[in-house]
Amino acid sequence: MSAPYKNLDRDTKHTHPKLNETERNLNRGWGDVKKEELYEDLAQSDADKQLAEDKMETKYEKSKPAPSD
């Protein structure tokens, strides 16, 4: 029984450039550190917008007359 490839030495050597692990972690997926500040800014602006909407809704609810039974 023969192996599916004949020259194991040639098959185990990588021909592509070495992957810089740190660079990959900074630029992809959960390790996207470069955009972290942007995400924090977006979260803060979303929170501010939601708070403003909640205040307007509360003010509107208070201005409505009380229901009379």
UniProtKB/Swiss-Prot annotation:
Which stretches of sequence are listed as region Disordered? 1-32, 44-69
Q: Which domain of life is it from?
A: Eukaryota
Q: Where is the composition biased (Basic and acidic residues)?
A: 7-32, 46-69
Q: Please identify the protein, giving its name as recorded.
A: Uncharacterized protein PB16A4.07
Recite the lineage of the species.
Eukaryota, Fungi, Dikarya, Ascomycota, Taphrinomycotina
